[in-house]
UniProtKB/Swiss-Prot annotation:
Name of the featured protein: Glutamate mutase epsilon subunit
Single GO biological process annotation from the record: anaerobic glutamate catabolic process
EC code(s) of this entry: 5.4.99.1
The organism's place on the tree of life at top rank: Bacteria
Upper lineage: Bacteria, Fusobacteriati, Fusobacteriota, Fusobacteriia, Fusobacteriales
First-tier enzyme category under EC: isomerase
Species: Fusobacterium nucleatum subsp. nucleatum (strain ATCC 25586 / DSM 15643 / BCRC 10681 / CIP 101130 / JCM 8532 / KCTC 2640 / LMG 13131 / VPI 4355)
Length: 485
């Protein structure tokens, strides 16, 4: 049976929305008309999607920084510093973990303690507890577009408050913000929650407000094979556009090998457009984001900044639209220090130097791109074959049987049988394919690549390869070579 895509009827959705927000009527004013008027009152340069479109016209790769302060004034100060000193083109606000998990009362208590002590005590910004009125101060006081980054499998209330406040971008999805983040939340629930979120975005789009919806590409950010991330981004894109989302960002979290990083983004762009065309989704704007290295950084500062430089160079030649810049002190309690600014300026300088340069799609990139597309196509085809008209149901079954499998994910709804490792060139391959629906040729290809590394390093093929690869980059290496004693 062919896949059936059906947008929730507007009146039906508004009734669903009314019933949902009834539980939070004392929390905020959820008037859509007021929110739409506020968005329309903002200048174009504060709208995330409009600025992306301008950067495409200007053939310019944009930089994006992030901040995670609990206190409002600290957050605004930090964001403005990243814009004025670090020259960031876009900014993100990281939401605290209590809000991500819908524990708003816990966030409220710690926010109150933070205000009393004049110190950020949460690991992010508790947007819902501040409410729309105070959140609009951020929009008004910061001169660049702002995105909400979170990690919530149920982002309905968070996105409601974000859009009401004037934010014009956020990331996530029913798969990408569940499987890598949560242990016990079912895909059925998270996919349904994000169906609400996507339809809400559709309502704003129908009223002339451009909202950028980024698919969260890094997943666990631990040796995720490109075909896994690309497959999930394709599926989440289809589910989003079904509900009226018009502006989507897709991307790559740096894998490590230059050829594979460039190839994976090329493969993703081609495949996304192919599936949008296949299902006759028109007028969908696709942009790309390259996430600098998300794993551990070397402890030595110069080595850490070398990794920022390496990431930027790859992003430059991938011709992405936007780079999500990382802070080498990523896990510090707050990010008011200079390391984020240093990363921004370093990234900006490399982009300025390399702006008019390019790498032609030489043979190795084309080969790897086609390899990723073959793997992705076989995963997607298997999921579609089990659809019975319902894509969400097929996605749930795909994870249950390991047709889709994210390495090192905490979710009990993820099979966790597939195991990755790098080959001798540092490309991510499959040490154990698990239940991924690959043909024998693909399986042979990966076995050969892993065997080549084994012979080159004179080591056994086992899980120790994977462990070594996980920690290699934090030691300033792409591959941690350990030969048999």
């Amino acid at each position: 049976m062919p896949i059936t895509f059906k947008k929730i009827d507007k009146e039906d959705f508004l009734e669903i929305r009314k019933n949902f927000l009834e539980n939070y009527k004392n929390l905020d004013d959820f008037d859509l008309n007021t929110a739409i008027r506020f968005h329309k009152s903002l200048p174009d340069h504060k709208n995330f999607q409009k600025k992306i479109e301008q950067s495409v016209q200007d053939n310019k790769i944009m930089t994006q920084a992030h901040s995670k302060e609990t206190l409002l004034e600290d957050l605004i100060k930090n964001l403005n510093t990243f814009y004025r000193v670090g020259q960031a083109d876009f900014l993100s606000i990281i939401i605290d973990s209590h809000t991500r998990e819908n524990h708003y009362d816990n966030a409220k208590v710690i926010l109150e303690d933070s205000i009393k002590s004049n110190k950020s005590l949460l690991n992010g910004f508790p947007l819902i507890n501040y409410g729309t009125k105070l959140a609009r101060k951020i929009i008004n006081d910061v001169e660049v577009p702002l995105q909400i980054k979170h990690g919530s499998p149920d982002a309905r209330l968070l996105v409601e408050v974000a859009l009401l406040s004037g934010f014009s971008a956020f990331d996530g999805g029913g798969i990408s913000h569940n499987i890598p983040f949560s242990k016990s939340i079912s895909l059925k629930d998270s996919l349904e929650n994000w169906k609400y979120v996507d339809r809400l975005v559709g309502i704003y789009e129908e009223n002339g407000i451009k909202i950028n919806r980024e698919i969260f590409s890094p997943l666990t950010a631990t040796l995720v094979p490109p075909a896994i991330s690309n497959s999930i981004q394709i599926l989440e894109t289809l589910l989003a556009v079904e509900q009226g989302v018009k502006n989507i960002s897709i991307g790559v979290a740096q894998y490590g090998n230059i050829t594979q990083d460039i190839a994976s983004l090329l493969a993703l762009k081609e495949h996304i457009q192919f599936y949008l065309d296949t299902f006759s989704f028109k007028d969908i704007n696709i942009s790309t984001v390259f996430n600098q290295w998300i794993g551990g950084f070397p402890e030595e500062e110069l080595k850490a900044y070398s990794l920022i430089s390496y990431s930027t160079t790859i992003a430059l030649f991938s011709k992405t639209n936007r780079i999500f810049v990382k802070n080498i002190d990523e896990y510090a309690k707050n990010s008011l220090g200079n390391t984020m600014i240093n990363s921004l300026l370093l990234t900006k300088t490399i982009l300025d130097i390399g702006n008019n340069q390019k790498i032609n799609n030489y043979e190795e990139i084309i080969f790897e791109k086609e390899q990723i597309k073959k793997e992705t196509a076989q995963i997607i085809a298997k999921i579609f074959s089990r659809c019975d008209g319902d894509l969400r149901k097929a996605i749930i079954e795909a994870f249950e049987y390991g047709v889709l499998d994210v390495p090192f994910a905490p979710s009990k709804y993820n099979l966790g049988k597939m195991m990755p490792a790098r080959d001798s060139e540092g490309m991510i391959r499959y040490l154990d394919i698990g239940n991924l629906p690959f043909c024998p040729l693909i399986e042979e290809f990966h076995n050969k690549k892993i065997k080549e590394r084994s012979m080159k390093e004179n080591r056994e093929i086992n899980f120790q390869m994977t462990i070594d690869d996980i920690f290699a980059m934090s030691q300033g290496k792409l591959i941690n070579k350990k030969s048999r004693e």
